[in-house]
């Protein structure tokens, strides 16, 4: 069996080498020729799996080690009788920890504010729910907005109410262009006009959920603090945008070792089910032991003392800004940052809590 895999997927050799030949490819550059004689394709969100890519292939299975599926043309896969799977929730814990780290980077007193700090969460799926639980451990007031989810322990308000009542807003929605609640340009000039100037905005979901030019104008007018891990025109990222945003990272919010390994594990499990193999391997056996930072009882004090050692988010910001060339981020350098990213560990690896 020939298996084509994105070169940046974690542990592909460990999980898949026993099944046949693995060809590692740059996901953004994958072509129809690359997959023409493959039976399985393993991708990330940078690969657009569409009719042009798969129509002349022998593919029987496509696995995407991602939460989202907007890069997969589901109807095209179904027309070709190609089974597919993604990895919902694989890096949800990592993203939740990223958001908390970003907030602490912007406000070193945020852990002391307790119920006086209101975190608004847009989208209460795998990531949003985990973030809400982690925020509750820190004593924050949590409100949310999700027309498709009702959770008994989260105040689910209207979108406008969350915009108006939050000290910080974190976005965790899929990218959708149709339906009753499309998320494309959910944050436009009207949304920004509803938000107090002091409200922090964090987007680690999908770039086009925020209208970039409206965001830039809002920051000019309000001085709003903003954190972006995703960008509307990614991998095209303008220097104009970077100049006004407080914290930028190269689409790595979910890049923990556990998150990436878990994503590959999930598509491995699906692969085995499709092809009739026993799924006997577990990613946990491949992870090294970490220093146990969380040995005390006071979570806030532990985070204040060790959060930077666990994840230095400022370094990611510096590295992305260093990729600017001729007015925008160099796309090759952007992809290289992600390819060579030193995967951080989730708090649980250090003895910390899991949502």
Swiss-Prot record:
| Keyword field contains Mitochondrion | no
| EC number in record | 1.1.1.290
* Top-level taxon of origin: Bacteria
What main location does UniProt list? cytoplasm
Q: What class of enzyme is it?
A: oxidoreductase
Compartmental location = Cytoplasm
Among the GO molecular function terms of this UniProt record, one is:
4-phosphoerythronate dehydrogenase activity
Residues annotated for substrate binding in this entry: 45, 66, 255
Q: Please provide an example of a Pfam family that matches this protein in its UniProt record.
A: 2-Hacid_dh
Q: Which UniProt keywords apply?
A: Cytoplasm, NAD, Oxidoreductase, Pyridoxine biosynthesis
Q: Which reaction does it catalyse?
A: 4-phospho-D-erythronate + NAD(+) = (R)-3-hydroxy-2-oxo-4-phosphooxybutanoate + NADH + H(+)
HAMAP family the UniProt entry points to: PdxB (MF_01825)
Subunit and interaction comment: Homodimer.
The protein's name: Erythronate-4-phosphate dehydrogenase
């Amino acid at each position: 069996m020939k298996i084509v895999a994105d070169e940046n997927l974690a542990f592909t050799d460990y999980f898949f080498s026993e099944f046949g030949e693995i060809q590692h490819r740059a996901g953004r550059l994958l072509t129809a020729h690359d997959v023409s004689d493959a039976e399985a394709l393993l991708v990330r969100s940078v690969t657009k799996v569409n009719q042009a890519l798969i129509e002349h292939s022998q593919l029987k299975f496509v696995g995407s080690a991602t939460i989202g599926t907007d890069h997969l043309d589901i109807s095209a896969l179904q027309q070709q009788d190609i089974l597919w799977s993604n990895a919902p929730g694989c890096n949800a814990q990592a993203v939740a920890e990223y958001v908390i780290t970003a907030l602490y980077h912007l406000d070193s007193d945020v852990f002391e504010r307790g119920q006086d700090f209101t975190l608004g969460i847009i989208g209460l799926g795998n990531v949003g729910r985990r973030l809400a639980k982690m925020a509750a451990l820190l004593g924050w007031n949590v409100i949310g907005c999700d027309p498709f989810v009702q959770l008994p322990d989260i105040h689910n308000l209207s979108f406008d109410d969350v915009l108006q009542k939050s000290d910080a807003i974190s976005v965790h929605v899929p990218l959708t262009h149709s339906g009753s609640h499309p998320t494309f340009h959910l944050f436009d000039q009207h949304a920004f006009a509803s938000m107090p100037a002091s409200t922090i905005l964090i987007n680690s979901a999908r770039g086009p959920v925020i209208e970039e030019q409206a965001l830039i104008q809002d920051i000019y007018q309000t001085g709003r603090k903003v954190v972006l891990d995703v960008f509307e025109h990614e991998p095209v990222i303008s220097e104009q945008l970077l100049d006004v945003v407080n914290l930028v990272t190269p689409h790595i919010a979910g890049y923990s070792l556990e998150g990436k390994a878990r994503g590959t594990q999930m598509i491995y499990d699906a692969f085995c089910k499709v092809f009739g193999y026993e799924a006997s391997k577990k990613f946990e056996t491949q992870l090294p032991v970490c220093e146990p930072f969380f040995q005390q009882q006071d979570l806030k004090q532990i985070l204040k003392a060790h959060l930077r050692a666990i994840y230095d988010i400022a370094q990611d910001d510096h590295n992305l800004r260093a990729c600017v060339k001729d007015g925008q981020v160099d796309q090759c350098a952007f992809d290289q940052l992600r390819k060579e990213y030193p995967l951080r560990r989730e708090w649980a690896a250090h003895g910390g809590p899991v949502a």
